Amino acid sequence: MPKAAAPAKRATRTKRAKKDPNAPKRGLSAYMFFANEQRENVREENPGISFGQVGKLLGERWKALNEKQRAPYEAKAAADKKRYEDEKQAYNADQEEEESS
């Protein structure tokens, strides 16, 4: 007669540190700028479409763009990345200042 399998151990979740609500928001990617701009167009062209299908269509449209068509979104993403880095640097300086006080 086969032995009973040992009871499976439950995986314990590691606790994440709470996010500071005052921390700067991460910069958006070029795709996210594109998706935010095109989402309503996709919904209007395909009424009744599910959330997942909207994402698939947006992904297909993004992949179909050439470098020239992606350039404005890449520029927005670069500017947003710079904004995030500047805000994060200022935020970290404030945090260090508070810790030393």
Curated annotation (Swiss-Prot):
Main location: nucleus
GO MF entries: DNA binding
Record InterPro entries: HMG_box_dom (IPR009071), HMG_box_dom_sf (IPR036910), HMGB (IPR050342)
CC per GO annotation: chromosome; nucleus
Subcellular location: Nucleus; Chromosome
Alphabetical UniProt keywords: Chromosome, DNA damage, DNA repair, DNA-binding, Nucleus, Transcription, Transcription regulation
DNA-binding region: 24-92
Residue numbers spanned by region Disordered: 1-27, 69-101
Entry protein name: Non-histone chromosomal protein 6
Organism: Gibberella zeae (strain ATCC MYA-4620 / CBS 123657 / FGSC 9075 / NRRL 31084 / PH-1)
